[in-house]
Amino acid sequence: MAAKLLVTGGFPNQAPNEVIDLKNENNHCNNIGDDLSGKFKYGTVGGLLNDQPVICGGAYIDTNQCYTVKDQGTLLSGTLHENRMFSASAVINDSLWITGGFDGSSLSKATEMFHLALGKSTPGPELPYPVYHHCVAKINDFQAMMIGGFYNLNPPYLYDFQQEAWTVLPSLMEPRGMAGCATFEEQGQVKVIVSGGTMNGQVFSSTEILDVQSGTWRQGPELPQTLYKHSMVTQNNQVYVIGGETKQGYQSTIYRMECSELLECHWQELTQKIQTPRCQFTAMLVPDELAKCEQN
């Protein structure tokens, strides 16, 4: 079971890996893998493949390479077809679906599926438009949603891997890039939440929640502060916002969305924090056996 939070890379460039126990504030966890700054810096993507954390792309070194984070170090696990930074990804059918991004000269609308067992990727479905600094939310085992990004006002799209087709969805209430997104269930229905982000120089504290079945957006709970370049994860149907950047600089805070039976939600700041404040990093949940934690 994926129960611990792994944070890798990001600004500042020398930020080490960190493992955080989201459920027990008294636990201190040993970090896994070595410092990623010598391999890539920020703007990476990643996911858990075969219970192993995999990180791909990023600026500006080895932007087409993928690494597996292990106890003994961060090991090269394969390559991508394209250089990619500021992409977005989701784990689909035990492969990492990597979408869009920037190759150093232009935006991409190509996608690829990285297969850990093969150590390489295969072409994925082409995006409706080139984009970076966007977000991808996994809806289920065969559907994922692409949201926001620069530099356009395009609506979100849902891709169905079984039907091999894109479906356009209703536009966000506020267009945004560098936002975070995650999924959760509410009364048995899948929801997508989008938080923070920026557009035209404005940084947002607002959140929006999509009812996937009805295709309607509603306002979500306001973040405690304006925030962008952060990450979001969902553990046991609880949504977390991690790190990011504000006008005051890089953030170490972790917020959890808490909702009443009346579906009134707010953000609760956790005692746990990132030891090195950072933004534009990759965060994912990893199995307990990968992270050794003990009481402080």
Model-derived segments and their meaning:
Residues 1-296:
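Kelch-like beta-propeller repeat domains
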